[in-house]
Amino acid sequence: MVVGTGTSLALSSLLSLLLFAGMQIYSRQLASTEWLTIQGGLLGSGLFVFSLTAFNNLENLVFGKGFQAKIFPEILLCLLLALFASGLIHRVCVTTCFIFSMVGLYYINKISSTLYQATAPVLTPAKITGKGKKRN
């Protein structure tokens, strides 16, 4: 199911806001045990993915189709936002959020490159079959 850029912007912005609010509401519970701090990092990684999607959709609406997110400032800004939100819960959440976000970013980049990257034909130099210098 494919939605338009504007709809995707609205959905990802709403999900980012709800995820951030949920992380803040349940911050005491998320910081209570080891497994829940890992879950807090996973939620922070989800916040990273949704905020990156919203940010890139906004850029596509403003600058036109085909605009791609770069490491600086888009990815770095969204990563810092997610790490800050995870840091408000627990220090371990920051570490797990960073790890989960990097894994998620790797797979997002891998999927994006297979779908949207244009493959250029490989040019091989032609073999010259003419008279060259004679060797004595």
Swiss-Prot record:
One of its GO terms (cellular component) is oligosaccharyltransferase complex. It comes from the Eukaryota. A motif (Prevents secretion from ER) lies at residues 133-136. Residues 1-5, 56-75 are lumenal. GO terms for biological process: protein N-linked glycosylation via asparagine. Residues 24-34, 109-136 are cytoplasmic. Keywords: Endoplasmic reticulum, Membrane, Phosphoprotein, Transmembrane, Transmembrane helix. The chain crosses the membrane at residues 6-23, 35-55, 76-108. Pathway: Protein modification; protein glycosylation. It is found in: Endoplasmic reticulum membrane. The modification Phosphothreonine is found at residue 124. InterPro entries: KRTCAP2. Pfam families: Keratin_assoc (PF09775). GO terms for molecular function: enzyme activator activity; protein-macromolecule adaptor activity. Its main location: endoplasmic reticulum. Belongs to the KRTCAP2 family. Subunit of STT3A-containing oligosaccharyl transferase (OST-A) complex that catalyzes the initial transfer of a defined glycan (Glc(3)Man(9)GlcNAc(2) in eukaryotes) from the lipid carrier dolichol-pyrophosphate to an asparagine residue within an Asn-X-Ser/Thr consensus motif in nascent polypeptide chains, the first step in protein N-glycosylation. N-glycosylation occurs cotranslationally and the complex associates with the Sec61 complex at the channel-forming translocon complex that mediates protein translocation across the endoplasmic reticulum (ER). This is Dolichyl-diphosphooligosaccharide--protein glycosyltransferase subunit KCP2. The gene is Krtcap2.
